[in-house]
From Swiss-Prot:
InterPro entries: AraC-bd, AraC_XylS_family_regulators, Homeodomain-like_sf, HTH-like, HTH_AraC, HTH_AraC-typ_CS, RhaR_RhaS-like_N, RmlC-like_jellyroll. Pfam families: AraC_binding, HTH_18. The gene is rhaS. Activates expression of the rhaBAD and rhaT operons. This is HTH-type transcriptional activator RhaS.
Length: 278
């Protein structure tokens, strides 16, 4: 597995924060690094396989990656990321107690993926741009300024996370997308889902199309197909079983949609003919 080292990304040995844009981020094989990072998805879509579990990421997704986590990117489509790298929560010169603002693992579950709405994403970009402008300066005031900006970033993300901000339709749509990530195999009635998340059906369609570039049903189908592709690569279950587990009631229909989406059949993927990056 590829290991990325801090010496290749941080501007100096005492720098606590570094900015690494990926505009765009291409498919990248599984790797880990000797530093932590906050991945901010600017726009586009892709699959982020995090410790073996696939997540669909779109504009507004924020991923918290620790130094022992392994992850990869696949099926990227104009996926643009900004990575905010930091050595460790306890390796800051002027800050302490940062762990309290970061996601915490509880009973083996780590909430690695958050979502923020468009207005918050704009504020995030401004903070990151300020950090980036100061990267070449190593005097104490500049170091303190970068660390303060990093603290502001964590506070903004914390306050704006789904757990704490559901007061507008953009935030409710983000919650709906997170719900689909966990319930993709269920039979989805869009009228009921819209009501569940206090959205009109028209607003749901419009905002989901704006955020993902896809209609709701197209987004759900792609999500199911991507989950199925992951299982084809990483499990021994039969194609039929995987189709059912991913919400398809007809394995033949599943195979047709799968080939249309990926230009490979499920059997091709199972046999590794697509040259997937391991």
């Amino acid at each position: 597995m590829t290991v990325l080292h801090s010496v290749d990304f941080f501007p100096s040995g005492n720098a606590s924060v570094a900015i690494e844009p990926r505009l765009p981020q291409a498919d990248f094989p599984e790797h880990h690094h000797d530093f932590h990072e906050i991945v901010i998805v600017e726009h586009g879509t892709g699959i982020h396989v995090f410790n073996g579990q696939p997540y669909t990421i779109t504009g507004g997704t924020v991923c918290f990656v620790r130094d022992h986590d392994r992850h990869l990117y696949e099926h990227t489509d104009n996926l643009c990321l900004t990575n905010v790298l930091y050595r460790s929560p306890d390796r800051f010169q002027f800050l302490a107690g940062l762990n309290q603002l970061l996601p915490q693992e509880l009973d083996g579950q780590y909430p690695s993926h958050w979502r923020v709405n468009h207005s918050v994403l704009q504020q995030v970009r401004q903070l990151v741009a300020q950090m980036e402008q100061q990267e070449g300066e190593n005097d104490l005031p500049s170091t303190a300024s970068r660390e303060i900006l990093f603290m502001q970033l964590l506070l903004l993300l914390r306050k704006s996370s789904l757990q704490e901000n559901l007061e507008n339709s953009a935030s409710r749509l983000n919650l709906l997308l997170a719900w689909l990530e966990d319930h993709f195999a269920d039979e989805v009635n869009w009228d009921a889902v819209a009501e569940q998340f206090s959205l009109s059906l028209r607003t749901l369609h419009r905002q989901l199309k704006q955020q993902t570039g896809l209609t709701p049903q197209r987004y759900l189908n792609r999500l199911r197909l991507m989950k199925a592709r992951h299982l084809l690569r990483h499990s021994e279950a039969s194609v039929t079983d995987i189709a059912y587990r991913c919400g398809f009631s007809d394995s033949n229909h599943f195979s047709t949609l799968f080939r249309r989406e990926f230009n490979w059949s499920p059997r091709d993927i199972r046999q590794g003919r697509d040259g997937f990056l391991q």
